[in-house]
Amino acid sequence: MSRYRGPRVKIIRRLGALPGLTNKTLKLKSGYINQSTSNKKVSQYRIRLEEKQKLRFHYGLTERQLLKYVRIARKAKGSTGQVLLQLLEMRLDNIIFRLGMAPTIPGARQLVNHRHILINNNTVDIPSYNCKPKDVITIKDRSKSQSIIIKNLNSFQKQKIPNHLTFDLMQIKGLVNQIIDREWIYLKINELLVVEYYSRQV
């Protein structure tokens, strides 16, 4: 299944707020009832499916990519669900988003693909690059790169930067301090349900 490129409002209307996908929010009219769930008994499968979809759309992954991360998480030590979230949060495109250098994860992915981003002074154009503690994230010293990032920072750096990251606004430089803690993953998600959804596929 390919990466979703359709209307983003349609997705958040069904799944709720997904800040990685879009910074838009829905204002529901008074008395609004979600027709997809009203007066219906929701199956356990559907509940797990929707949690999985939240994760996939928030981080902008294909089905194959998400399944790959689940398999990696299952082989690692610790809680599979927590390891899965940590793997996704430490992706370069997500780190750029969490630093406020892009309004959304798709926007961050575009910055990486267009070679605006440096990791430890080396150009990295792979959005799925796994960031590690002590990685230093900067931008290329060229006017186009500078203007894009500065515009994004002025517009979108409103939320608090999580404690596993540090950002120097004057130098436009980010630092990965550590692997993210679960409490700093602000997406409303039950990762256990995602793991259960994939239990027969891994």
UniProtKB/Swiss-Prot annotation:
Disulfide bonds: none annotated. HAMAP family: Ribosomal_uS4_B. InterPro entries: Ribosomal_uS4 (IPR022801), Ribosomal_uS4_bac-type (IPR005709), Ribosomal_uS4_CS (IPR018079), Ribosomal_uS4_N (IPR001912), S4_RNA-bd (IPR002942), S4_RNA-bd_sf (IPR036986). It is found in: Plastid, Chloroplast. CDD domains: S4. Belongs to the universal ribosomal protein uS4 family. The lineage of its organism: Eukaryota, Viridiplantae, Streptophyta, Embryophyta, Marchantiophyta. One of the primary rRNA binding proteins, it binds directly to 16S rRNA where it nucleates assembly of the body of the 30S subunit. GO terms for biological process: translation. Gene3D superfamilies: Ribosomal Protein S4 Delta 41, Chain A, domain 1, RNA-binding S4 domain. The gene is rps4. Its main location: plastid. Keywords: Chloroplast, Plastid, Ribonucleoprotein, Ribosomal protein, RNA-binding, rRNA-binding. One of its GO terms (cellular component) is small ribosomal subunit. This is Small ribosomal subunit protein uS4c. Residues 90-154 form the S4 RNA-binding domain. Part of the 30S ribosomal subunit. Contacts protein S5. The interaction surface between S4 and S5 is involved in control of translational fidelity. One of its GO terms (molecular function) is structural constituent of ribosome.
